[in-house]
Amino acid sequence: MTDPTKRRMIGSTVPAKVREYYNQGHQCLLQEDWEMSVLFFSRALHLDPKLVDFYVFRAEAFIQLCDFSSALQNLRRAYSYDPGNNKYLNRLAFVLYLQGQCLYELCDFQEALCVFLQASDLQPQNASFSYRCMACLLALKRYHDCLALITREVKQGRASADVYILRARLYNFFQKAKLCYQDLRSALLLDPLHAQAKGLLQKMVDQAKQSLQDASTLAVQGKVHRALKCINCAIENNPLDPNFFFFRGTLRRRLQQFDHAVEDFLKAMDMVTDTQDNLVKQAQRQLLLTYNDFAVHCYNHGAYQEGVLLLNKAIRDEQNEKGLYINRGDCFFQLGNLAFAEADYKQALALSPLDEGANLRMGVLQEKLGFCQQKHRQFQTAEEHFSEAIRHSPQKPQYYLHRAKCRQFLQNTLGARLDVATVLLVNPEYPKMAAVMNTLFPSMTVENVLKSQVAELAKLQLSRMIENGPKNIYPQSTVVQRLLERRKAQVLVKLWKQERLGTPEEEVTLYQAPQLAEEKKVKTARRRTSLTDSYADQTSSGSVFSIVSISTSGPEMSTSQEYKSSSHTAIEFSESTLLKPQLSVPRKSQELTWSPKVVQAVTENLIQNATEVTPAYGQRDSKKATQVPKPKKTEDPKDPSQSTSTTEAPEGPRPSKSRSTLSVKERIRRAKAVRAQGWKLKAQRSSQKVTKTPSLTHSTTHSDIGESANDTPGQTPWPSKAADSLSFSEISSTDLSSSESFLELTNLLTQEVQQIPGDREKLTSDD
């Protein structure tokens, strides 16, 4: 049993000893006697373990002795007794930092990392601990862990310029140039004068230029995929250069990556500055080409509606590109919107009238429109569509065959024959011609048809249509029109000056035979073209073909008279198919030279008077040129050689007619014949060959085509309506003077224009 007195003495002496150890330890701290200080504080804590301050004092002594582990143990013990004291926590974190830094300097990066991580856990808001952890991870080459730690710091909003630069270097190491560039931009925003950021940025720009050069080389070599990888690397190193996106867009367009190509071009256009107008134009052009190629891709895969939408975008920005209209017209054609397709093809032809592809497509479209109208029995409209197709593609025989069938329904037999003859001219072995040949040319072979006069006329029309081509269908540009007008004015001035100087002219009359015209060309060393020639050359034959008055000799007669339609078919004469009027004037009578207006009036007058109605087969023509009818003898033809009408001029003198009894047409012909006789006498004098022989003219006029004047052997045929006109060789030049004939002709032209409607009505009533 313990003495109570002794217990009381022990209890009173323990606090005194603790106080004594405390004073001695504190004195040693002041004297920097770290070991004795640790000894005294340890004795005091042995007497009373709950003295928290003594742990802190002993930890300070251990810190000075660089015994960080012991210091950490004492600080943790103190913090465990008083968790709310932040001073203990801050001191503990500081000791951990010192320990980690010492380990880092000793290259013990793994232990240093563990220490820094402990300090960072104690004070997460302290960025210095995280930075030291990053350094340890980099030293350990744990780049992914370091990048994750940096990303965590950036997300927490504690990133600085150094942090961005550190992560940029990591991205550059991982070849993530795009992210590297972004971090450099962020670092420069925080510190515009950061030297390391500027240096690294310049390095990336140089890498981008090198990648662009490599991509260009590979693209030229045809290695498009590798070139695309290089240009992607260039964009990652310098994503603010619009040239890189433009180049990548072109590569993607070649690889048919149209969506990405459009994005690149749009991005390049957004990134350009005011000084890069050329790049903007190139990007717009490439964007249009991308839309067009994308539309073609959709067209090939049957997505016609999508192709139309893409081409609408392209045409909205570029209205002068014919290829866009052609492609959109193809899409409309496949969708069945023929009206829209026709409008697009017309627009393309207006931009380029000679474009072969546009003309070919227009021909196919017009053919389909013609089939649609023909199906609805609208043969007149179908004929117009087929004629339009022929104007665009005159060498396609199927168009002529389709139009010939339409003209058969319209009872235009002559036009159908011309079309069939044209088909044989273009392709003599064209299939499916037997039925049409039997209908329009019965009992005739292909060779006979090709030798006929209808074939000659069809050949003439075909050659003119091919020569003219589609260039006259659509209006020319303003510049071309002005150039043509200027040249025409220069030619007119030159001709006017030559007329003032008295330059002789040798011209051929309206109804002179082609053989005589060729002989005159051989005799004439230098021939001058009249002003009306240019007008006649510019006319192009339309859907209604015309007939030329072709004179034949002897056995060569027109085969078009052997087969006649049972209906009344209107036969029209066009100015383009008539022989060109050329009138000669001697030098002594220059004041009587016909002006171009008079010549043109004569031509138009004759064209209007040339329209006649072909009677039915076997019927008699009842038309009358004068009040007294002319007797005729007609019989049914026995063979094709007897079906032609021959007009002969009588050898004996003709009974003279007064001017009052002559009709208007006969008076015009007579006046022209007088002038032609004067020209002929002049030609005979120059050649010094005066011969007088009775002329026998065989001419096929517009009235002869529509009638059947066949004579039996042994009978003399009555003169036809064409024979009633005066022959050039039988009229004396003394009947009318040149001046009187010219004035009379001028007056008659004026009267004829006014009397033509009445005469036509009169003829119609007589029929």
Curated annotation (Swiss-Prot):
It comes from the Eukaryota. Residues 684-718 have a biased composition (Polar residues). Keywords: Repeat, TPR repeat. The keyword Repeat applies. TPR repeats lie at residues 18-51, 53-85, 93-126, 128-155, 208-241, 242-275, 288-321, 322-355, 363-396. Disulfide bonds: none annotated. Residues 612-733 are annotated as: Disordered. InterPro entries: TPR-like_helical_dom_sf, TPR_rpt. Coiled coil: none annotated. This is Tetratricopeptide repeat protein 16. The gene is Ttc16.
